[in-house]
């Protein structure tokens, strides 16, 4: 079941994101990975600017995904599923929910260029790698230059 997540859910969101993000260790550049991957203060800032949803099973949040409207597009933000629940359709259900909520013509997602599993997930759902990724990352995200250099953008028309 999908439910909107709110401030009081921050600790479980923190847990899901940081457990799932361990997959990045050894994959993304060492200077871009840190533990925790998303500190609590950063999570609070992110929650203030986007809508975040959780997939619940047995009363427990096991996956999270958010969206943020920026200018003329919608961004998929912070898509994570606990490792033991991955490849069971939870990410697909959350992404479908985000697509239904999208009110703009374009839905974009940024991810690490070496996170092949994430890229394949979005491609499976019709997203295409966009060649103008540097311009898009600078226009719609607020990222350090190093992350821009090591990321890709995928998009789909809604």
Whereabouts are the PLM-identified features?
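Conserved beta-strand in the GNAT
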Residues: 54, 60-68, 75-80
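Conserved beta-strand-loop-alpha-helix junction that forms the acyl-donor binding cleft
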Residues: 109-119, 135-140, 145-149
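A short beta-loop-alpha structural element at the N-terminal edge
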Residues: 1-15
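Conserved acetyl-CoA-binding loop of GNAT-fold acetyltransferases
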Residues: 123-132
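Conserved GNAT-fold acetyl-CoA-binding loop/helix
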Residues: 15-43
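Active-site acidic-Proline motif in GNAT/NAT acetyltransferases
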Residues: 69, 82-88, 114
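A short helix-loop-beta-strand connector motif used in the catalytic cores of GNAT acetyltransferases and
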Residues: 41-54, 147-150
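Conserved acetyl-CoA-binding loop-helix of GNAT-fold acetyltransferases
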Residues: 81, 87-100, 124
